[in-house]
């Protein structure tokens, strides 16, 4: 592959979050990220009811922090649609093109909405807000940033996040950014465990002949054999469970 083609296939994950949807900012966000403004194009998109598993894996780096639970409620739409669970969703998009990660990050602006307004007025996140987080007694613990949009921070994060949210067959074959492989085994999942045979209640993640990310198939094999894996089973499985069940 020529160098220009390699650069052209850089991809990044964008999530239009529940607060943007609640405030009817979807059209604005999409117009800001249009090919006219960014030189980037869609590689894939989907409407996602975000499960607890998917939310937890997406924000895994924040596990254990005081705002983690609130962050999960935020991305799952529980905070903006407390009595309307059918409206809880995000729009997940893969953008592709030269310098995709940095171009989208530039348009989004700083993560903190107040900082975004001060340093880059007019950017997408300048329309966001900060929300106070309190414990059960009412004590203020800190703030949560409701900043409308997620964008991969770097190419390594982009790879992890794309593989977390999207299967290879969600993306046109010519736009696959990472190696794929045909599964030679069956993999089933139930209650945090992997199996290679079907039983009642087990969900089929990959069947023999299915196409998967090569790194996922390697991780599934290691996990099934009880070997250490840098990729937790939830990070592989979460995308296959997208929109399978509605969480209250």
Language model features: what each stretch is:
Residues 1-248:
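Non-catalytic terminal and connector segments of soluble metabolic enzymes
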